[in-house]
From Swiss-Prot:
It is found in: Host cytoplasm; Host nucleus. The keyword NADP does not apply. The active site is at 80, 108. Keywords: Decay of host mRNAs by virus, Eukaryotic host gene expression shutoff by virus, Host cytoplasm, Host gene expression shutoff by virus, Host mRNA suppression by virus, Host nucleus, Host-virus interaction. GO terms for molecular function: RNA binding. InterPro entries: PA/PA-X, PA/PA-X_sf. GO terms for biological process: viral RNA genome replication; viral translational frameshifting. The probable endonuclease active site in the N-terminus and the basic amino acid cluster in the C-terminus are important for the shutoff activity. The C-terminus acts as a nuclear localization signal. The C-terminus is recruited to host protein complexes involved in nuclear Pol II RNA processing. Its main location: host cell. Plays a major role in the shutoff of the host protein expression by cleaving mRNAs probably via an endonuclease activity. This host shutoff allows the virus to escape from the host antiviral response. Hijacks host RNA splicing machinery to selectively target host RNAs containing introns for destruction. This may explain the preferential degradation of RNAs that have undergone co- or post-transcriptional processing. The record marks 28, 65, 202-203, 206 as: Important for efficient shutoff activity. The record marks 195, 198-199 as: Important for efficient shutoff activity and nuclear localization. This is Protein PA-X. It comes from Influenza A virus (strain A/Beijing/39/1975 H3N2).
Length: 252
């Protein structure tokens, strides 16, 4: 599974997932399913944010080409992928600037158009079950929940799916592709079932060539969302109100 993840996902997503697991004291060599799940969740969050802006009229628009002269504001603030300290700094800054209620748990995104935090979920189970689990944990009407599955299903708070159909279809297609790639290599069952995961781990320890023939079909292009986060948590210059909350990192 580890080899699959490293070949299937953008290197920067893999690096962020490694840092996240290290921060929580988890071993990606052992918890390979969690490694894959974190990478998948990160990618969905970035895809959710990519290309979405707010123009001068306050309207949400989709722009796929970078135009440095365009007076556009990123619609979504990315919180997922940052270390906990910086993530809470961003959340606090958003709350102070917008008057939004501070969430009890770290959300994944903030939507400047709808003025709400968003919790993104990616599940291997039934979407409604995972949605209820998220809702019971968060217990806040101010955090919008949007759940995606690997089968193309989705569920969102009050059936408000936030994004346009094409943007959501892009996410669903990517998730379905990941599932198919896992299934082709005998990894899907272990990804879904803990019992199968233990069996798969034993196989992985015996053979490190499980994904040797994996074709690298995924684009290595760094998404706009990922560029904002590189090389670390640099000032993205997205809004003047949040600018002071981001730490400057020395150039490498």
């Amino acid at each position: 599974m580890e080899d699959f993840v490293r070949q299937c996902f953008n290197p920067m997503i893999v690096e962020l997932a490694e840092k996240a697991m290290k921060e929580y004291g988890e071993d990606l060599k052992i918890e390979t399913n969690k490694f894959a799940a974190i990478c998948t969740h990160l990618e969905v969050c970035f895809m959710y944010s990519d290309f979405h802006f707010i123009n001068e009229q306050g309207e949400s628009i989709v722009v796929e080409l970078d135009d440095p002269n365009a007076l556009l504001k990123h619609r979504f603030e990315i919180i997922e992928g940052r270390d906990r300290t910086m993530a809470w700094t961003v959340v606090n800054s958003i709350c102070n600037t917008t008057g939004a209620e501070k969430p009890k748990f770290l959300p994944d995104l903030y939507d400047y158009k709808e003025n709400r935090f968003i919790e993104i979920g990616v599940t291997r189970r039934e979407v409604h079950i995972y949605y209820l689990e998220k809702a019971n944990k968060i217990k806040s009407e101010n955090t919008h929940i949007h759940i995606f599955s690997f089968t193309g299903e989705e569920m969102a708070t009050k059936a408000d799916y936030t994004l346009d159909e094409e943007s959501r279809a892009r996410i669903k297609t990517r998730l379905f592709t990941i599932r198919q790639e896992m299934a082709n290599r005998g990894l899907w069952d272990s990804f879904v079932s803990p019992k199968e995961a233990k069996k798969q781990l034993k196989k992985d320890l015996k053979s490190q060539e499980l994904c040797a023939g994996l074709p690298t079909k995924v684009s290595r292009r760094t998404s706009p969302a990922l560029r904002i986060l590189e090389p670390m948590w640099m000032d993205s210059n997205r809004t003047a109100a949040l600018r002071a909350s981001f730490l400057k990192c020395p150039k490498k």
